[in-house]
Amino acid sequence: MNRDAHTVQAQEKLSERCSDCATLSYDLHIHSCLSPCGDDDMTPGNIVGMAAIKGLDVIAVTDHNSCKNCPAVMKLAAQYGILVIPGMELTTAEEVHAVCLFPELSAALEFDRFVYEKLIKFPNREDIFGKQQIMNEEDICIGTEPNLLINSTTLSFDELWDI
């Protein structure tokens, strides 16, 4: 399997740091500033910085119906030996919130495109829900998502289960 470069780098540093670790510390449900429920301070740099301060070995970025901030977090975290599992909190047609985790960034981004086609499009109102910011690894906003990401998708739970 072809591994993403940032995943390989993080795994190598994690292996060095935890060669005799009996346990790993992790948080597998983190929202960034892309999620409407996330704070504007939840930038890639702040997520990675807090993970390092807390001594986390593994984190997963799981924004609502999007994986677009995973690349920046993965790039930064690899420098600290923190393994990032790219993910998404998908909202099904039944309003079930399912945390989806991926072995590779490429798989996450492919799923992101698939889910976006299934997202019920409703314009985001920044005055109510806040900005939905797409960031780079320098914590610079490189775009915003115009459609509200906390909406459900047309994807049923059964369809998700079968993927």
Regions from the language model: what does each represent?
Residues 26-30, 59-60, 84-88:
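Hydrophobic faces of well-ordered beta-strands that scaffold small-molecule active sites
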Residues 47, 70-73, 160:
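Aromatic/hydrophobic pocket-lining residues that form π-stacking "cages" and hydrophobic walls in ligand
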Residues 32-42:
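Acidic/histidine-rich helix-loop elements
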Residues 2-17, 23, 76-163:
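Extended substrate/RNA-proximal surfaces in nucleic-acid metabolism proteins
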Residues 29, 63, 100:
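Conserved, mostly hydrophobic/aromatic
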Residues 33-35, 61-71, 91-94:
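Active-site environment of divalent metal-dependent phosphoester hydrolases
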Residues 48-64, 89:
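Divalent metal-dependent hydrolysis catalytic cores, especially in the metallo-beta-lactamase
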Residues 18-21, 32-34:
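An N-terminal RHG(E/S)-centered segment typical of histidine phosphatases
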